[in-house]
Amino acid sequence: MITAVRTGQSAPGKHSHAAEFVKELATYLKSKHGIDVTVKTQIGGPVGRICMISNYENLAEYEKAWNKIHADPEFHKITQKASGIMNPGHTHDTLWRSA
């Protein structure tokens, strides 16, 4: 099992807008690509951090899913909404495997 975690940082004063944006993106990924995404906000540590968590059977499934997503023009259109509400350059992707 592979768990993908994408963490981003909301712009100052935009945390609630950023959380709504990430939830919209998660809803789209489920409806269009069948990917279950959990959205979490950090409650300790740096303020304004938001993450999306999704699970895949293996790395090949992860790569197949994200290649399809990155080829989706509607996905790119939705991500443009992040401008002004997410801090650019503060996105961090990690992949985890079951022990």
Where are these regions (language model features)?
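Short S/T/G/P-rich N-terminal loop/turn motif that feeds into the first structured element of a domain
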Residues: 1-76, 81-99
